[in-house]
Amino acid sequence: SLKNVIRKELDSIKKEFGSQRKTIVEDAKEAVYVAAPIKEETVYFVMDRFGYSKTMDKATYQRNKENILKEYKFIVPCMNTDKICIFTNLGVMHQIKVLDIPAGKFRDKGVPIDNLCNYDSTKEYIIQVLDAESMIHSSLLFATAKSMLKVMDGELLNAAKRTVQATKLSEDELIEVIPVDWTEESEDKVVLQ
């Protein structure tokens, strides 16, 4: 029958071209791959007035501190495992993992912040940049163009999403976000200019 003919042909092909199995099939435990832990270190997130950003290690920052303070609009010390929080005039907070921001030397140009998060420089502009770790342990004072003030616990903005509405604005514009450490007894004053 046709079935036997096919079997004989397959057996002859197996004998002619067959080889021994190179791997062992066994009932073993599941393979677990452990990624090497990231060494935590202090880095500096810097962004110039054109929105080009990068991180640099502490030694590079210390060597070029004077020039960095002149050339960069935002300078944020943070851990390399932390997140950077960018507040815009629309009341939106964008988050970027520090590990996603390319590290560079002092003279390197950096990467546009538009390419790293959902920030769009054609519709909004940056008013404050903070590191997430210090932000969640302090209160934030929001000030708008119409002189409205709001104090909010930074822990409320600790979210997994990359873009969060930090505060609602009704036909207004956020002009400042200030981290503050107020207590019930403190009598700190805020002066808007």
Label the predicted regions:
Residues 1-193:
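C-terminal interaction appendages of subunits in large macromolecular complexes
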